[in-house]
C-alpha cells in the first residue's frame, strides 16, 4: 500500500513577497547568461585558428570554465616532398636492434640509399679498410698476369654472368669513347671522328647550351668548331685517308695513260665519220689522226703458239694421270684394310662361339 501513497506537496500561495523574489531570480539568470556569452566571445578571440569538437552528450556552457570543450590544434597538411636524410633516419629507427633485421640487410639499405650521412660512410670506410687488411694478410699475393675473367671465376661467378658483364663493360667503354672522341656539327649534323683526346675533355656541344649562353656561347662554339676542324685536318686518320685517296687518284691517272688502245667515245665517233667521208679527203684531218691497225701474226708465230699450247695440254694430262693413279692406289689400300677388318670380325665370332660351347659343356 505504501507504493501507491503519494507525498503531499506544499501548496504555494501567490503573494506580493513571492513575486518580488521571482523577479530577482530572473534578473540574476539574465546577468549570468550575459557573462557566459562574454566568456565565449573571449575564448573565440583567443583560440582563433582552432576548431572545437562538440560531443553528442554535451550540455550547455552554463557552468563556465568547468564545462569548457577541449580545443584541438589545427592540423597542417604534410608536404609530399621529404628530404633523403629524414627518410634514412626514419628507416634506421625502424631497423633498430629491436626490429630483428640482420646487419647485412641494413648495410644493403645503406648502400642503396641515394645520399648517406657521414656517419655511415665513415663506418663503411673503416670496415672496408679492415676487410682489405685481413684479405692481404690471409690470402697469398695474386700473380701479375691474372686476368679479369680468372678473378671472376675465383669469386664463384658463373660463366654466363661473367660474359654478360664483360659485354656490358665493353659497351659502356664504347659509349664513353663515342661521347669523348666525336664532334657533331650543328649546321650539317655530320659526325666527325677525332683523334684520341688524352685530356678527356667534353667535345660534344648541343644547341641548348648555345642558346642558354647567348651570342657569346655561339662565338665560343664557332671558335671551338674551327679548332676541332684543324685538329681533324692534321690528325693521323685524316692524313691516312688523304694519302690513300691521292694514291688511288694517281693510279687511276696512270691506268688512263697506259690504256691507249681503248679510244675515247669522241675520238671513235670522229674516226667513224672520217671513214665514211663526212669531212672530205682533206689532209688536215687524215694526217692528224693516227689509225692503228691490228697486230697480225705470221705463220711461224702461229705455229710456235700451237706448239706451246699442245705442250701445256700434255703436261696437264700427265698431271691428271698421276692424280688418278694415286687415287686408285688409295682405293686399293682401303679395300685391303676393309678385308682385314672383315677377317678379324669373323675370327672374333669364331672365338666367341668356341668359348660359349666350352662354358656350356
Curated annotation (Swiss-Prot):
Compartmental location: Cytoplasm; Nucleus
Gene Ontology process terms (BP): spliceosomal complex disassembly
Major location (coarse): cytoplasm
Record bears the keyword Protein biosynthesis: no
Keywords linked to the UniProt accession: Coiled coil, Cytoplasm, Nucleus
Bias (Basic and acidic residues): 44-57, 120-134
Region (Disordered): 1-82, 94-147
Biased composition (Basic residues): 1-10
Comp. bias regions, Polar residues: 135-147
Listed GO CC annotations: cytoplasm; cytosol; nucleus; U2-type post-mRNA release spliceosomal complex
Ranges in coiled-coil conformation: 295-349
Protein name (Swiss-Prot/TrEMBL): Uncharacterized protein C17A2.08c
Amino acid at each position: 500500500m505504501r507504493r501507491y501513497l503519494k507525498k503531499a506537496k506544499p501548496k504555494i500561495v501567490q503573494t506580493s513577497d513571492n513575486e518580488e523574489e521571482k523577479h530577482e531570480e530572473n534578473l540574476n539568470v539574465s546577468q549570468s547568461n550575459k557573462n557566459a556569452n562574454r566568456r565565449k566571445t573571449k575564448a573565440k578571440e583567443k583560440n582563433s585558428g582552432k576548431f572545437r569538437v562538440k560531443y553528442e552528450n554535451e550540455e550547455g556552457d552554463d557552468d563556465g570554465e568547468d564545462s569548457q570543450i577541449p580545443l584541438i590544434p589545427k592540423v597542417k597538411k604534410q608536404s609530399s616532398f621529404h628530404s633523403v636524410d629524414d627518410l634514412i633516419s626514419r628507416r634506421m629507427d625502424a631497423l633498430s636492434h629491436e626490429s630483428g633485421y640482420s646487419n647485412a640487410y641494413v648495410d644493403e639499405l645503406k648502400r642503396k640509399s641515394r645520399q648517406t650521412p657521414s656517419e655511415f660512410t665513415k663506418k663503411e670506410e673503416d670496415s672496408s679498410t679492415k676487410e682489405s687488411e685481413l684479405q692481404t694478410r690471409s690470402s697469398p699475393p695474386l700473380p701479375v698476369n691474372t686476368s679479369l675473367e680468372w678473378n671472376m671465376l675465383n669469386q664463384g661467378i658463373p660463366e654466363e654472368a661473367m660474359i654478360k658483364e664483360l659485354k656490358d663493360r665493353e659497351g659502356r667503354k664504347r659509349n664513353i669513347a663515342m661521347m669523348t672522341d666525336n664532334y657533331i656539327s650543328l649546321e650539317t649534323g655530320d659526325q666527325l671522328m677525332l683523334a684520341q683526346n688524352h685530356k678527356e675533355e667534353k667535345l660534344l656541344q648541343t644547341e641548348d647550351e648555345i642558346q642558354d649562353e647567348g651570342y657569346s656561347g655561339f662565338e665560343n662554339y664557332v671558335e671551338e668548331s674551327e679548332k676541332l676542324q684543324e685538329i681533324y685536318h692534321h690528325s693521323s686518320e685524316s692524313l691516312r685517308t688523304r694519302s690513300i685517296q691521292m694514291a688511288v687518284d694517281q693510279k687511276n691517272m696512270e691506268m688512263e695513260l697506259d690504256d691507249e688502245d681503248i679510244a675515247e667515245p669522241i675520238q671513235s665517233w670522229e674516226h667513224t665519220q672520217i671513214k665514211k667521208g663526212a669531212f672530205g679527203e682533206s689532209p688536215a684531218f687524215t694526217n692528224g689522226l693516227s689509225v692503228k691497225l691490228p697486230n697480225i701474226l705470221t705463220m711461224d708465230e702461229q705455229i710456235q703458239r700451237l706448239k706451246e699450247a699442245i705442250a701445256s695440254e700434255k703436261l696437264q694430262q700427265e698431271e691428271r694421270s698421276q692424280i688418278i693413279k694415286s687415287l686408285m692406289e688409295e682405293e686399293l689400300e682401303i679395300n685391303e684394310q676393309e678385308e682385314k677388318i672383315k677377317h678379324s670380325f669373323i675370327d672374333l665370332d669364331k672365338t666367341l662361339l668356341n668359348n660359349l660351347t666350352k662354358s656350356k659343356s
